[in-house]
Design a protein with these regions (language model features):
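Sec-dependent N-terminal signal peptides
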Residues: 4-15
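Beta-strand-rich N-terminal accessory domains
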Residues: 20-85, 91-151
Length: 152
């Protein structure tokens, strides 16, 4: 009986091992596109400091175009030019705790500040998660001030 249950679980539970069938992320020319069967986000690459161009809800066919050319990550009014922009698209297998997803990592630098934005795209989910990681210093970005803004 135990062997039969194990066999049934492997046969019918195997579908969840391929949970990224509808998820995608790719950079073509200067446009980054990420999404799944329900939602799609399109960005202008901008050296890695991406700018949202369009958000599309595929379930109802509605699309919202962003008319601003401001980068999605902004720490000050006068941003330096981004450098070292890179993209990594990695399928992540499911675990006992988390379902499978597609991880899209966008990394770039603003002078001495390194920024990594990690988008998580799940099958059949009408939302795209985003985590932002920072490393380095921002003194040069804020005009070379040595005093922390929190200490004022």
């Amino acid at each position: 009986m135990k062997n039969i249950l194990t066999l049934l679980f492997v046969l019918f539970g195997g579908y969840s091992l391929h949970a990224q069938d509808t998820c995608y992320g790719f950079l073509r020319n200067d446009t980054l596109t990420i999404g799944n069967n329900l939602v799609e986000r399109t960005f202008l690459w901008n050296g890695g400091n991406i700018i949202t161009y369009r958000l599309t809800d595929k379930s109802n066919g509605k699309s919202w175009k962003n008319h601003s050319l401001t980068p999605d990550f902004r720490v000050t009014k006068n941003l330096p030019q981004p450098s070292n922009g890179s993209l990594k698209v990695v399928p992540v297998k499911e675990t006992k705790i988390f379902p499978a997803y597609l991880k899209v990592e966008v990394s770039f630098s603003l002078e001495k500040l390194d920024i990594k934005r990690v988008y998580r795209i799940y099958d059949d989910c009408p939302a795209i998660a985003c985590d932002t990681y920072l490393r380095g210093t921002v003194n040069s970005i804020f005009g070379g001030r040595e005093v922390s803004a929190a200490d004022r």
